[in-house]
Amino acid sequence: RKPRARTNENIVNEIKFWIHKLGVNEFIFRDPVFSIDRKKTLELAELIIKEELDIRFTIETHLNNLDYELSSKLKEAGMFFIQCGVESVDQDVLNDAKRFSLKKADEVEKIEMLRGLGVKVMGMYILGYESDTRESCLATIEYAKKLNTNIAVFSVFTPYPGTPIFVSFKDRITATKFEEYNQWNPVFKHDNLSKDDIRSLLTFAFDSYYLNIKWFFKNFIQQLI
């Protein structure tokens, strides 16, 4: 089924509704590839600026769909936060999972660009891909610390029922209840990692990231100086 895109005018009219009716001035665009249509996204930013809408907003997108012109225009329109999927540092793991990724040097450059514009960044990472090992997961955690985004979120690779990828994992699924599909609980028998291994890596990822002095200094101490 072909997706149906809303017009920029329709989006701006809804923003105006929330501003005038309820005094809302902060928004999240719940579209995982918000800027995939560069021209349309640029025109939306320009329309928000033209209408003088005093708002702040968050987007989610792939770093590949951002450049300086578009990012700076979105920032001018009110973008202050971006969620982007980094997923893994291991290109072989991403290839096996059929996940597209930028070259790591380009990824670093895009995040530095956003940081330079004053946009806060959330990096999203996945542990426990089918070909992941303990070593590849630890490398991803270290890479996340190197990128040092404002927020990092780590989750377990989860093939959800009803998705195409679920079919290839169907014979290995161990989850018996839908509530187990929560991106924290491993739901299939992994060849390289036990369920306890994956849970331990996930806990270590959060502890290692948020107790890291580099992150703590950037996000807390510098704001007090």
Describe the predicted segments one by one.
Residues 131-137:
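Active-site glycine- and acidic-residue-rich loops that bind
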Residues 8, 38, 134, 194-199:
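Generic detection of long, well-ordered alpha-helical segments
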Residues 1-122, 129, 142:
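Radical SAM [4Fe-4S] cluster-binding motif and immediate context
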Residues 124-125, 154:
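A short glycine-rich, hydrophobically flanked beta-strand micro-motif that places a catalytic Asp/Glu
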Residues 138, 142-154, 158-225:
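C-terminal accessory regions of radical SAM enzymes
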Residues 31, 124, 183-185:
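Short, solvent-exposed beta-strand edge segments and adjacent coil->beta transition regions
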